[in-house]
Amino acid sequence: MSGHNKWSKIKYVKAKEDAKKGKVFARFAHEIMLAAKSGGGDPDLNPRLRAAIDGAKAVSTPKENIERAIKKGTGELGGATIQEITYEGYGPSGTAFLIEVATDNTNRSASELRTLFTKNGGSIGTPGSVAYQFERKGEARIMAEGLTEDSAMDLALECGADDVEQGDSDNEWVFVTSPTELNNVCAALREAGHTVISMKLISVAQNASVINDLETAKAALRLYEALDDYDDALNVFSNFDVAEEILEQLG
C-alpha cells in the first residue's frame, strides 16, 4: 500500500495547529450540522454523524456545542440554512485547488474566495474547471496508540480498506477506500475496537504537480494556508507536491 495523500509533506512544512486558533471546534460543528441535515440526528442510524461526534469529543468539544450543532442540522433550532458547496480554482503554475465550504451565503463565499485567490497569485475557476483532475475517495481516521505501520496495513486489509498511512500525529491513522465502501470500512474498524474520529469523502489528485522552484512552492503554500484559514472552509485539496530538495529549503 502506498501513500495516497501528497499532503503529508505539505502538512509537515506548514506545521499548523488549528486547535490553537479555535478552528477545530467550528469545523466539527459544521460537519455535525451537515451530517445531521443529510442523515438525521440519531448517530446510531447516521454513520457520518457518529464519526463527527466522536471526532468532536476527541478534541474535547463541549457537549452543549455538539448538541446545538445537531439541533441546527435537524432544524430544531432556527437560524440560517447551512449548505455544503465546492469551489474550484487555480494556484501558482496552474496548480489545481478544490475548496469545500459550509456556508449560508454562496454569493458571499464566492466573492471572499475570489479575493483570497487573487491576493495569493491564483484565480477562482468555474464549476468543473479543475474537478476532473481529482478522484473521489472515502477516508476514515482513527486514533490508536501503539499501532505500527505493519499492523496498520494488516488492519486495513482486514477491514477492506484500499490504503493506509499515518495521519497528523503518531497515533492517528488514515484509511482510504472507495466511496461506496466507506461505511463498511468504518463499521469494520469499530468492530475491531477502534473509534472512528472522522469519516468523509475526499478528493485525491490523479496526478501530482511537482513544484521544483522555491518561490513557487512558497506561493502555493501561502495560497493553501489562506484557503485553509478561511472561516467557512471544511476541506482544501490540491494537486501540488513539493520536491524533496525544495522541502528541505522550506524546512
From Swiss-Prot:
It is found in: Cytoplasm. One of its GO terms (biological process) is regulation of DNA-templated transcription. Keywords: Cytoplasm, DNA-binding, Transcription, Transcription regulation. GO terms for cellular component: cytosol. InterPro entries: Integrase-like_N (IPR017856), TACO1_YebC-like_2nd/3rd_dom (IPR048300), TACO1_YebC_N (IPR049083), Transcrip_reg_TACO1-like (IPR002876), Transcrip_reg_TACO1-like_dom3 (IPR026564), YebC-like (IPR029072). Transmembrane segments: none annotated. It comes from the Bacteria. One of its GO terms (molecular function) is DNA binding. Belongs to the TACO1 family. This is Probable transcriptional regulatory protein Amuc_0709. It comes from Akkermansia muciniphila (strain ATCC BAA-835 / DSM 22959 / JCM 33894 / BCRC 81048 / CCUG 64013 / CIP 107961 / Muc).
